Amino acid sequence: MRILADENIPLVDAFFADQGSIRRLPGRAIDRAALAEVDVLLVRSVTEVSRAALAGSPVRFVGTCTIGTDHLDLDYFAEAGIAWSSAPGCNARGVVDYVLGCLLAMAEVRGADLAERTYGVVGAGQVGGRLVEVLRGLGWKVLVCDPPRQAREPDGEFVSLERLLAEADVISLHTPLNRDGEHPTRHLLDEPRLAALRPGTWLVNASRGAVVDNQALRRLLEGGADLEVALDVWEGEPQADPELAARCLIATPHIAGYSLEGKLRGTAQIYQAYCAWRGIAERVSLQDVLPETWLAGLQLNPGCDPAWALATLCRAVYDPRSDDAAFRRSLTGDSATRRAAFDALRKHYPPRREITGLRVATGGQAELQRVVRALGAQLV
């Protein structure tokens, strides 16, 4: 097999070395010419895999190390008989850790008690669904809007988007980018909806940039709106709006899901799908390649404050403020320089582990145990 992989996909050799020749390119450089002699294509969300790129090529399998598939022309895949796989849920936990880090940063700035807020989660799939479980496990009030899931689960606890926007103090977006269809999400938060947000609302977008109208949001913030914003995704990536970023409390270069586990899990999942397509046995597993965590464990005193424990556990694995600082330093120079810097920050992103790898002892204190379980850490 002739395999072409995005150069930023980790451990391609570990999983695919015995399957043929492997060539690597930057994801944005993968085009029609690059696919002329390729059987298997492995990509991330930065590569548009379209009819124009694939027509006439020998590509028979496409794997994307992402949850979303809006960069894949699935209609053409079906027409051309091209097998494909995404990696649903691969980086979901990393995104949840990112959102928790943003909430802690916002609470610190606002002097707010996270337990007293009402949370609105828009999109309850792989990422949003996990976030809802964590927030409710902590005993916090959560409203959920997910029309497609509500149609499948008519007895579920769902609310309309209008009610969520009217009642939630914190809004976290986790929808795919759908430009058409029954439930389009492009500019789901458009100018009228953004303007109608309650004063003091916190908005987090770690889904797709165009789910929020970036220009409308910038105008709103420039006008002095009482709104705290954390953005990890941007319209027109890798070109992020520096004026919008300057008005966000947290601004990062699409790295919410960039945990080490998430990256390796994505490669492992498309390898599993590839093996199923080929009808061959898997020779490598995620556990074979996942290194030990840097932090072996934490011992909490039974008398410690649960809110302090929550913040300590979350920040033990991730604090978005370091990524925010690095991103802001990159927002200088001309457009080409900023675009290159955006991709460079993602390419050279340092290792980050997930909270699920933390082993935490609580001395048997029930409230601390509840916090540890809700976060998904390992209780010992």
Swiss-Prot record:
It is found in: Cytoplasm. It comes from the Bacteria. Substrate binds at residues 45, 66, 258. Its EC number is 1.1.1.290. This is Erythronate-4-phosphate dehydrogenase. It comes from Pseudomonas paraeruginosa (strain DSM 24068 / PA7) (Pseudomonas aeruginosa (strain PA7)). GO terms for cellular component: cytosol. The active site is at 208, 237, 254 (proton donor). InterPro entries: D-isomer_2_OHA_DH_cat_dom (IPR006139), D-isomer_DH_CS (IPR029753), D-isomer_DH_NAD-bd (IPR006140), Erythronate-4-P_DHase (IPR020921), Erythronate-4-P_DHase_dimer (IPR024531), NAD(P)-bd_dom_sf (IPR036291), PdxB_dimer_sf (IPR038251). Pathway: Cofactor biosynthesis; pyridoxine 5'-phosphate biosynthesis; pyridoxine 5'-phosphate from D-erythrose 4-phosphate: step 2/5. It catalyses: 4-phospho-D-erythronate + NAD(+) = (R)-3-hydroxy-2-oxo-4-phosphooxybutanoate + NADH + H(+).
